[in-house]
């Protein structure tokens, strides 16, 4: 890596940890180790890509999710690796000063900056429900989009309207794509989306000058290419007909499938179960006992009832799955379980460090169960 390492070292990140981060991002997108090196070269380039982040009708959840990411200290890495020219929440200035800075950035970096929009855009009553500096937010967004090298809709609200567009939709909220017809908008839905999906997308744009492969809804396929149901840890219980019927019942306590509690995993695409959140094992809704509510999918999240049954798109049981009757520990060695975790982890696109932690935790759990 011949790029400038000053940024990395200034935040207490050594080269090894930084390369692990780049390798994890590449693995998340299903890319090779060569791609990891190319990403490392690009993101340490002193010519940082300018980013303009505009918030519309949003709750700031996407920003909070990004700032609380760790892999390691992604919040610092992102804010220093890119040149964040405008972000209302994170700006030290306010009022006329910050608006002037935004307009200067739009002119200075025309054709070079990445435009990120967070939140739905209200169109009813000429857009008066979200105003900035005396102008409807839709006008700010359209102006910024004219000179953008890439456009990203982050979060479900920006990707397809989200909660603001549900029900009677009093503000006439729409998605970013609807106000920018004819432009390619990269959608990264989620409420909030996993910050590493956003980071990996930006890293791909920085490295290759183009978006990653997108699906028919303009979502990166590395993150939204498979049904959550297909790689959920509770899927074996679904195949075996074991379902929790009420919160707190035996099935719920035993970790059985949450389909009958309204889990939308069978009709929602995402990598929630494999990437999880903030490098903490088991941190995603289903793992902590709550059904997925389909926030990644238009017409499902915020539209279907939380406990309304999902449409099962693929009812064929997986050909290879663990036995739901197997007891933890048993005759399977901790080393074998750690090795299995490593194989599954590589396939799922998680980091090597996460896999090692899985193996260490499994050994500890087995030792505890034996009373050692």
Swiss-Prot record:
Signal peptide start and end residues: 1-37
Gene Ontology cellular-component terms listed: [Ni-Fe] hydrogenase complex; ferredoxin hydrogenase complex; membrane; periplasmic space; plasma membrane
Binding site for [4Fe-4S] cluster 1: 59, 62, 157, 191
Listed SUPFAM superfamilies: HydA/Nqo6-like
Gene3D superfamilies with a match to the protein in the record: Cytochrome-c3 hydrogenase, C-terminal domain (4.10.480.10), NADH:ubiquinone oxidoreductase-like, 20kDa subunit (3.40.50.700)
GO MF annotation list: 3 iron, 4 sulfur cluster binding; 4 iron, 4 sulfur cluster binding; electron transfer activity; ferredoxin hydrogenase activity; hydrogenase (acceptor) activity; iron-sulfur cluster binding; metal ion binding
Binding site for [4Fe-4S] cluster 2: 229, 232, 257, 263
The protein's Enzyme Commission number: 1.12.99.6
InterPro entries from the UniProt entry: Cytochrome-c3_hydrogenase_C, NADH_UbQ_OxRdtase-like_20kDa, NiFe-Hase_small_C_sf, NiFe_Hase_small_N_sf, NiFe_hydrogenase_ssu, TAT_signal, TAT_signal_bac_arc
Enzyme class, broadest EC rank: oxidoreductase
Membrane-topology descriptor: Peripheral membrane protein
Any one biological process term the GO annotation gives: anaerobic respiration
Residues the record lists as binding [3Fe-4S] cluster: 272, 292, 295
PANTHER family attached to this UniProt entry: HYDROGENASE-2 SMALL CHAIN, NIFE / NIFESE HYDROGENASE SMALL SUBUNIT FAMILY MEMBER
Family indicated by similarity: Belongs to the [NiFe]/[NiFeSe] hydrogenase small subunit family.
Protein's recorded name: Hydrogenase-2 small chain
